[in-house]
Amino acid sequence: MSERDAIRAFSHMLETIFVRMRAEGTGSQTDAMQRWLDLYNVGSLPIDKKSYKALRLMDRETTDQQKEDATCAICLDNLQNNVDIPEDHVIKEELKIDPTTFGTTVIVMPCKHRFHYFCLTLWLEAQQTCPTCRQKVKTDKEVEEEERQRNLEELHDSMYG
């Protein structure tokens, strides 16, 4: 997916969120989303800064496992609600997930904050931190280096006990 397509998909998601919030008439949610948009410039990270592998390693839950009052801090929707994925959204091959699961999955980050999988993938296109506490998310390069180091240690241990 090109940067332009990612921005278009992200914009579509935000538009859907704003329409939903306007329909509900909750000004505080709209204000919160507007502040979020003002704080974060939606750009795309270079490919060596992506976090797809780290995302695949994070714990997963389904939307029906979430508490009634749990909210996704990215879209401000209840975590029990499935995400309506735009028809033109292309799921990145690196995520290795089927479209049905993508909309019903909640990711539990290492810091224990939970987000809709779809929302978090869009967030990680532009940021390398948890949207709530700003804990850094490892890049694919860092995950690969850790895996390489772990494999070397296992090989060493198997050879020298």
Curated annotation (Swiss-Prot):
Chain positions of all zinc fingers (RING-type): 72-134
Swiss-Prot/TrEMBL keywords: Metal-binding, Zinc, Zinc-finger
Membrane-spanning parts: none
SMART domains assigned: RING
SUPFAM superfamilies from the UniProt entry: RING/U-box (SSF57850)
Any GO molecular function: zinc ion binding
Tagged with keyword Zinc: yes
InterPro entries, per the entry: HRD1_E3_ubiq-ligases, Znf_RING, Znf_RING/FYVE/PHD
Source domain of life: Eukaryota
Region (Disordered), start-end ranges: 140-161
Matches recorded under PANTHER family: RING ZINC FINGER PROTEIN
Protein known as: Uncharacterized RING finger protein ZK637.14
